[in-house]
């Protein structure tokens, strides 16, 4: 097992974790139906970038 040679300070730990924060989901308005959806994802009614891609 790896064991650290010296204890890492709170500052170094914080600097390492500075990139771990989660960002909020980016939402867009669909041009066809006007509903909100996540970026780069198909809407609930099956549209993606103005085209019908899923038939239910």
Curated annotation (Swiss-Prot):
GO terms for molecular function: structural constituent of ribosome. Residues 1-37 are annotated as: Disordered. Keywords: Ribonucleoprotein, Ribosomal protein. InterPro entries: Ribosomal_bL32, Ribosomal_bL32_bact, Ribosomal_zn-bd. Residues 21-31 have a biased composition (Polar residues). One of its GO terms (cellular component) is large ribosomal subunit. The keyword Ribonucleoprotein applies. It holds the Pfam family Ribosomal_L32p. Belongs to the bacterial ribosomal protein bL32 family. This is Large ribosomal subunit protein bL32.
